[in-house]
Amino acid sequence: SMGESECEGRDRMMRLYNFAKENIPGFENAAMLGAAEQMGIRQTRMLQGEYVVTKDDVKSRRHFETSVCRGRDYYTPYGALLPKAIDNLIVAGRHYSVESDAQKMSREIPPCQAQGEAAGIAVALALNSDQALREVDYKAIQKQMRAQGADPGDEPSANALCENNIAAE
């Protein structure tokens, strides 16, 4: 249960704190100022989207033509924001469509913010053109992201894995 997990977490924290005070030079006078009131959940259920980003996609820096935002060196295709079985819903941040191991590598705050920006643009475009979210042209999202000063990942970095350099391998 959450309560048991929180107790175990606090117990581990105190053991580490005491170990550091007793065994690591410079920590003798350390003081614990506090800890989080509640345990944070980093990962739960994963969305099944039109595309599921894989660990290999993130590690290999796979570029997608339909990319609507970019992390450090990885790209998020528009389909990873669109749930497979639900129309007119878009998801951004740590809940986008991604494998568990890939999510651990790609849930940083800046790309989550960029996904949110892309999702907001997609919704605005859908509303303004009376379209379903699946019908929104990813190129229009990319164009608006660029106009707002964001990197939609439409231009692959020099170290990106692109379809044209996959064929060359």
Can you name each region flagged by the protein language model?
Residues 3, 7, 106-114:
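Short, conserved micro-motifs enriched in small and acidic residues
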Residues 1-102:
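Mobile, glycine/GP-rich and aromatic-enriched active-site lid/loop segments adjacent to catalytic centers
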Residues 127-169:
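Non-catalytic terminal regions with compositionally biased, polar/charged low complexity
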Residues 2, 102-107, 130-138:
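Composition- and surface-driven signal marking solvent-exposed, interaction-prone regions
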Residues 113-130:
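Internal hydrophobic alpha-helix adjacent to the cofactor/substrate pocket in enzyme cavities
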Residues 59-62, 117-121, 163:
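Short, surface-exposed, polar/charged, turn-prone segments marking secondary-structure boundaries
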Residues 17-24, 123, 127, 149:
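Structural signal for hydrophobic packing residues in well-ordered secondary-structure cores
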